[in-house]
């Protein structure tokens, strides 16, 4: 087995906390594409749905650029979940006080490789 070419996809400012998406990303790192999608579809998390969209986008980028490529030849190489923008707002509380509310977002970067078999 040798690795021929890499294809990437990015999801920016996705509405989920990076802390919630990272454990899901760890489950699919290094897995074949079909297995990674099966894992993500079986998870009930919002982050799994967002991650699935980015993984599918990376795979479709790979199949668009290489017409001879099938889903069986693709595997997930790199999955990075970084902090995105934080939306801060005020949450009114009792007796005239206010708390700060921080809505977090994340950036997801997925890199897939094509797996080819050949003689050595």
UniProtKB/Swiss-Prot annotation:
InterPro entries: Ribosomal_uL22 (IPR001063), Ribosomal_uL22_bac/chlpt-type (IPR005727), Ribosomal_uL22_bac/org-type (IPR047867), Ribosomal_uL22_CS (IPR018260), Ribosomal_uL22_sf (IPR036394). PROSITE patterns: RIBOSOMAL_L22. It comes from the Bacteria. Signal peptide: none annotated. The keyword Ribosomal protein applies. CDD domains: Ribosomal_L22 (cd00336). Residues 1-25 are annotated as: Disordered. Keywords: Ribonucleoprotein, Ribosomal protein, RNA-binding, rRNA-binding. One of its GO terms (cellular component) is cytosolic large ribosomal subunit. Disulfide bonds: none annotated. Pfam families: Ribosomal_L22. The keyword Ribonucleoprotein applies. GO terms for molecular function: rRNA binding; structural constituent of ribosome. HAMAP family: Ribosomal_uL22_B (MF_01331_B). This protein binds specifically to 23S rRNA; its binding is stimulated by other ribosomal proteins, e.g. L4, L17, and L20. It is important during the early stages of 50S assembly. It makes multiple contacts with different domains of the 23S rRNA in the assembled 50S subunit and ribosome. Part of the 50S ribosomal subunit. Belongs to the universal ribosomal protein uL22 family. NCBIfam families: rplV_bact (TIGR01044). This is Large ribosomal subunit protein uL22. It comes from Borrelia recurrentis (strain A1). The gene is rplV.
């Amino acid at each position: 087995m040798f690795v021929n070419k890499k294809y990437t996809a990015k999801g920016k400012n996705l509405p989920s906390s990076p802390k919630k998406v990272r454990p899901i990303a760890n489950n699919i790192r290094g897995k074949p594409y079909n297995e990674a999608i099966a894992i993500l579809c079986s998870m009930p998390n919002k982050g799994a749905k967002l991650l699935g969209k980015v993984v599918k986008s990376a795979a479709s980028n790979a199949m668009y650029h290489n017409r001879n490529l099938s889903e069986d030849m693709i595997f997930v190489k790199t999955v990075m979940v970084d902090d995105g923008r934080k939306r801060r707002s005020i949450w009114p509380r009792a007796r005239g006080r206010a708390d700060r509310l921080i809505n977090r977002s994340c950036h997801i970067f997925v890199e897939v490789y094509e797996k080819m078999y050949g003689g050595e």
